[in-house]
């Protein structure tokens, strides 16, 4: 959530920045007008309350002197009625202001490229060379069926589209991948967590999913519970409403969790395979940082995600998202895209973002600065480390062999009882 004072004090510059994120001028002009009116009413309210206090003192004095205080009482009643009217008007303005503020996206960092959509994202670097196959490559969904490790048909029967069963070495491969990821992040100082898989609406508001993106989630009817779309939500809200000791920062969390997404706007996209599911596993990284350190922490987080891909020997590239393609809460985002041979392209496997104080303001997560003793908003960061299903897809396609088998990456073999290859059924 943005700071109204910051918008007020730097309106023109921030309006330009928010325009690059699709915020129309009329919205910000309405916010400005409401803010001006609100401050005018607050001044008037304070003046009237001062008059009421004086009138109250005059009434008390008159009563002590056994004088008629009817005029003072009438005057005070009139002032009190005016105050009540102003308070009602202020409440209505506050509601309108809040409705606008909670739907405004974060302000992009100056280093973020300006652009309308993914076509204007900027490539930062690449790692690894895509393998040159001397046979026709199969898509991971075909490989999974041929190997007997992914069952789409029964997933659809039991639940519906975009669901599947992992089976045998497929289930073991997925488990090996996320255990490997968690172990690697633990080496980098992340505290491993097991979170609730349901959160309340306040938590969804805190990280920016609510109220704007309700349609993308699964809610439990008749309750305050929502199935988590990512472990970012419970991990970030772990400190909601708390004041941390500045000496403890930065704090690193990592967690494996299922992610539940309705994919409301994805009809017709990635209808086959592991790229876009209603339920999938993801290892998440979350950081709590002092503001002055948060961009260094973002770069470190990207390196942590890259480390997984490099140890799996999967070719990838790092992209800086432009203003028009960033997520709602992000001030800056890097995407890591892994090479998918059957599609002859790179696909997102991790997204690492610095939200600056956007989520911290919504969730009221603060710290006491040991230098001056003041309580301040901290910065929160989040990133995938990595999306597990997409990692399975990348391994199946990049490690496939001409005979239909799939070689298991070396770093995963200790997690799979020493198995080196998955053979066709």
UniProtKB/Swiss-Prot annotation:
Subcellular location: Cytoplasm
Listed CDD domains: SerRS_core
Keyword flag Heme: no
Pathway stated in the Swiss-Prot or TrEMBL entry: Aminoacyl-tRNA biosynthesis; selenocysteinyl-tRNA(Sec) biosynthesis; L-seryl-tRNA(Sec) from L-serine and tRNA(Sec): step 1/1
Enzyme class: ligase
Binding site for L-serine: 230-232, 284, 384
Residues that, per the record, bind ATP: 261-263, 348-351
EC number(s) stated in the UniProt entry for this protein: 6.1.1.11
Catalytic activity: tRNA(Ser) + L-serine + ATP = L-seryl-tRNA(Ser) + AMP + diphosphate + H(+); tRNA(Sec) + L-serine + ATP = L-seryl-tRNA(Sec) + AMP + diphosphate + H(+)
Alphabetized UniProt keyword annotations: Aminoacyl-tRNA synthetase, ATP-binding, Cytoplasm, Ligase, Nucleotide-binding, Protein biosynthesis
Single Gene Ontology BP annotation: seryl-tRNA aminoacylation
Entry-linked Pfam families: Seryl_tRNA_N (PF02403), tRNA-synt_2b (PF00587)
Claim: Cytoplasm is one of the keywords in the record: yes
A GO CC annotation given for this chain: cytoplasm
NCBIfam families from the UniProt entry: serS (TIGR00414)
PANTHER family: SERINE--TRNA LIGASE, SERYL-TRNA SYNTHETASE
Domain topic, free-text comment: Consists of two distinct domains, a catalytic core and a N-terminal extension that is involved in tRNA binding.
Biological role: Catalyzes the attachment of serine to tRNA(Ser). Is also able to aminoacylate tRNA(Sec) with serine, to form the misacylated tRNA L-seryl-tRNA(Sec), which will be further converted into selenocysteinyl-tRNA(Sec).
Quaternary structure annotation from Swiss-Prot or TrEMBL: Homodimer. The tRNA molecule binds across the dimer.
Name recorded for this polypeptide: Serine--tRNA ligase
Organism from which the protein derives: Streptococcus thermophilus (strain ATCC BAA-491 / LMD-9)
Biological classification of the source: Bacteria, Bacillati, Bacillota, Bacilli, Lactobacillales
Name of encoding gene: serS
């Amino acid at each position: 959530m943005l700071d109204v004072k910051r918008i007020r004090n730097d309106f023109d510059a921030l309006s330009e920045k928010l325009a690059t994120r699709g915020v129309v001028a009329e919205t910000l002009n309405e916010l400005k007008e409401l803010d001006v009116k609100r401050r005018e009413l607050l001044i008037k309210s304070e003046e009237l309350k001062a008059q009421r206090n004086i009138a109250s003192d005059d009434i008390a004095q008159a009563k002590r002197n056994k004088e008629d205080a009817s005029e003072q009482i009438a005057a005070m009643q009139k002032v009190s009625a005016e105050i009540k009217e102003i308070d009602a008007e202020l409440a209505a303005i506050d509601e309108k202001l809040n409705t606008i503020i909670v739907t405004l996206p974060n302000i992009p960092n100056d280093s973020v490229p300006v652009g309308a959509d993914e076509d204007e994202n900027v490539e930062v670097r690449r790692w690894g060379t895509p393998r040159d196959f001397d046979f026709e490559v199969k898509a991971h969904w075909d490989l999974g069926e041929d190997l007997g490790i992914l069952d789409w048909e029964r997933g659809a029967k039991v639940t519906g589209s975009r669901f599947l069963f992992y089976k045998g070495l497929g289930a073991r491969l997925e488990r090996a991948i996320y255990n490997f990821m968690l172990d690697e992040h633990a080496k980098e100082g992340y505290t491993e967590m097991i979170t609730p898989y349901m959160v309340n609406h306040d938590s969804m508001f805190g990280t920016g999913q609510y109220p704007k993106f309700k349609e993308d989630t699964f809610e439990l009817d008749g309750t305050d519970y929502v199935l988590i779309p990512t472990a970012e939500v419970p991990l970030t809200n772990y400190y909601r409403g708390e004041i941390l000791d500045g000496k403890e920062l930065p704090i690193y969390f990592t967690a494996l969790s299922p992610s539940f997404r309705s994919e409301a706007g994805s009809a017709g996209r990635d209808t086959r395979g592991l790229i876009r599911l209603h339920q999938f596993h993801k290892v998440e990284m979350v950081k709590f940082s002092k503001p002055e350190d948060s961009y260094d922490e973002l770069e470190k987080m990207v390196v942590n995600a890259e480390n997984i891909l490099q140890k799996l020997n999967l070719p990838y590239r790092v992209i800086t998202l432009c203003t028009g393609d960033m997520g709602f809460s992000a001030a800056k985002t890097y995407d890591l895209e892994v090479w998918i041979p059957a599609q002859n392209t790179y696909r997102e496997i991790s997204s690492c973002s610095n939200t600056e104080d956007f989520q911290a303001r919504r969730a009221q997560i603060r710290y006491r600065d040991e230098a001056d003793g003041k309580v301040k908003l901290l910065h929160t960061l989040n990133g995938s480390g990595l999306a597990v299903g997409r990692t399975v897809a990348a391994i199946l396609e990049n490690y496939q062999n001409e005979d239909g088998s799939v070689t298991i990456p070396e770093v995963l073999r200790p997690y799979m009882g020493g198995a080196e290859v998955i053979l066709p059924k």
